[in-house]
Amino acid sequence: MKTNFSIIGCLFFSPLALASQGTLHYSDFINEMYQESGGIRAKALELEAELLRSKQTDLYFMPKISAESKYKSDTTRGDITDSKVTASSLIFSTTIADRFKEKNSRIHGAELSLLKEKENLYKTLVENLIGIKYYNNLEAKAANLEQTAVELYQQIEGRYVSGIAKASDVEQARLLIQKIKTESESINKEIELIKSNIELATGIAFPAQGVYLPDNIIDKINTYTINDKKIYNNLDYKLLSEQADAAKFNAWQQDSLVQVSLVAEERYNNSQRVDKDSWGGIQVAVNLFDYDKKIARQTGIKAYQVLKTKMDFKYKELLAKMKSLQLTINSNEKELQGLVDQSKTTEVILANQKRE
């Protein structure tokens, strides 16, 4: 006995928004899950790395200082030590704007990647908690049916002892109890399997007292309307978009035209400053032709085109999932209605047999 609860996985809005709209009784479990998840820690470290890397762009003008010293032995002049200290600072480049755009895209991509990891865990937890909730309801109904079936069996057995009922009636009543017990055992097995899935996905033990899922979560899912415009809010799609932009801006930096820097150089001979060789000024570098840089730019553009192609494919994939989602919703509604009808039919049968 298995009910499909995969509807949650196909929703294209962020389920994290649900957690922010009210106090949820399972929020502590969610927080613990986030803290214990190795995947989330890895994504958080990736974001920290991008934020550190962004300082290279923000402080592009910071001077670069280097020192160099050479020891020479000359038969006429004796031992000589030539030293040089050079400082340079970039003040303009035709690629600076693209560097900042790439930085922003990479940071946004890392943030989306972290959010996506959290969303996946949240989605998995909610999916399974909904499963537990429905199976618990079924288990409660099965328990009531079993109690009714036992009472019916006792009545039929009493009538059989009195010679009113037949032996076949007793066997049918016993068979009904066994069938209901089998269904109850199947339900309990499904619940334990779902708990195991939660532990596997989250890395933490499922609480013995259970996790309460508010009804408003299911209400929000039931009232969710499918809209293909919401595809653009899908985290996978947005992440591909940021990665594509980062690749594009990086490609545009590979073949820069002009670079202007402040440069100062101090030369020393045996620790004595050499004034005629020491200087400071502005250095302008113009890239007239560099085959390697042109190839690097073209390669970067190809990487951008690959990601754009993946975005188009992801859009079509999500659109197909939305259509499949509607079919899944209709199928699940019919399946659940069938289970409800079966339950009502069983109750009617038991009631009729009691009256008889």
List the model feature ranges, each with a label.
Residues A19-S66, I164-S168, Q172, E199-W252, ...:
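Bacterial Sec-pathway N-terminal export signals of envelope proteins
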Residues S14-P15:
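N-terminal signal peptide c-region/cleavage motif recognized by signal peptidases
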